[in-house]
Amino acid sequence: MRYYVVSVQHNKDKDAENRSVPKAFDTELQAKQAFHAQLGDDMSNATLDWSVCMIFTDIGSVIASERWEVPKPEIVI
C-alpha cells in the first residue's frame, strides 16, 4: 500500500487556494513524518491564513487530517 501527503492552503495576500502535489511514501511512518513537517511549514508561513493537511492511501482511506488557521482577532465592544 502507498501513502500520500497533500496540503491545501489559502494565501491571504493573493486570496487564492493552493494544493500541493501529493507526495508518495511506502510506509505509514514516513507519511506521518512528512505530514507533521508539512503542517509545521504551513504554520510558519506568514502568507497563509489556513491550511488542511492530510494523509491518504492509494485505496482512498484517510489516515490523518488536520486543519490549521490563523487565530481570528477578538472583537471587543
Q: Which residue stretches match the model-derived regions?
A:
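Short aromatic-glycine-(Arg/Gly/Cys) micro-motifs in beta-strand/loop hairpins
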Residues: 1-21, 49
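Generic hydrophobic secondary-structure signal
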Residues: 5, 30-33, 44
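A generic structural signal for ordered secondary structure
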Residues: 10, 21-26, 55-59
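Alpha-helical and His/Cys-centered functional microenvironments
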Residues: 13, 34, 42
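A short, exposed loop/beta-hairpin motif centered on an aromatic-Gly-Thr core
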Residues: 16-33
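Short, mixed-charge low-complexity intrinsically disordered segments
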Residues: 37-77
